[in-house]
Design a protein with these regions (language model features):
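Class I S-adenosyl-L-methionine-dependent methyltransferase catalytic core
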Residues: 1-149
Length: 149
């Protein structure tokens, strides 16, 4: 429900997209456009097939890149997102650097949200310019919702 409120006509950045579950669901619920970032070849192919099967090619773009390597050249100069979803592998420990990079690149809209999917119990450190506004636990997962400050 928290996410539904923000989806209407939103632009979404889905980092570590996998087969696209989050981003595809966003489109189905009213997002205007989703950028999918994934770089594992077998999963990337499934993601492209899923987008094609749902006929979402005009509402999405797939970028074959490691999300930790995004920079200002990855997107258009004025590109901003209302929602940025980060679903890195559970073993990944560079979350602080990723969030710091997102904030420094200034690709999050003023009132946009960053959602981070983590293993329940992980104690991540976040940059000073990121404020956690909510957390939700589901099974073995935790979703951290935050904003830049």
């Amino acid at each position: 429900n928290f996410i539904n409120f923000h989806l209407k006509d939103s632009k979404v950045l889905d980092l570590f997209s996998g087969i696209g579950s989050f981003g595809l669901e966003c489109i189905s619920r009213g997002s205007k456009f989703v950028f999918f970032l994934e770089n594992y070849p077998p999963v990337l192919e499934i993601l492209k097939i899923n987008i094609s099967n749902l006929k979402y090619e005009t509402k999405s773009k797939v970028i074959d890149i490691d999300a930790f390597k995004i920079n200002n050249n990855t997107f258009k100069d004025d590109q901003k997102f209302q929602i940025i979803f980060c679903d890195p592998p559970y073993k990944e420990k560079k979350i602080e650097l990723l969030i710091k990079n997102i904030i420094e690149m200034n690709i999050l809209e003023e009132n946009g949200i960053i959602i981070i999917h983590r293993k329940k119990g992980d104690l991540d450190i976040y940059p000073k310019k990121f404020k956690v506004i909510d957390t939700k636990n589901y099974g073995l997962s935790t979703f951290v919702f935050g904003r830049k400050i």
